[in-house]
Amino acid sequence: MLIPLKKMIFAGQGGSDIMIRKVNRKDIPECVRVIRYSHQTVADEFGFTKENAPRYVAFATDENRLIWHMDQERRLMFLDEENSVIRGYYSLLVKQNGECELSNLSVLPEYRHQGIGTRLFRHAISIAREHHCRMMRWSIVEENTLLRNWYERYGAVHTGTEKYDFFPFTCGYMEIRL
């Protein structure tokens, strides 16, 4: 069972501290970089560009968008850091209907395959439960079967797809009961 946590600290290699904590306003520029750079690998793999997918997260995320998420939508925003280096990010929009929306779960490519994404996803589930959410939903690039399979390993269910004119890919939708 996951325990509710506002901040998680893990013992890192060589005595370093690994922490998941809330995003502060001063973190936003670096969080933008983490999101854009993380999602650029998917853009490169599937041929998305600013021209054919200007609304894709790797191209559309900027400081104003994250400030809007923080101030207007009141999203819960968290980052993973080790020794003050931000390595990962996610946000959670808590809705009134007992659901929440996970967005922009990101891990910088050079830090992948170290359990950071798993820790961030589990943290998101824990925070969603703290806020009395019964369901967490999110979207993925449907063609990214590696990512879909990764989420399914943690109990997520694929719920459908949607093709939009403004994306050169199909949006896949996933959820997990909490």
Task: List where the protein language model places each region.
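Non-catalytic, surface-exposed connector residues within folded enzymatic/regulatory domains
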Residues: 46-47, 101, 114, 145, ...
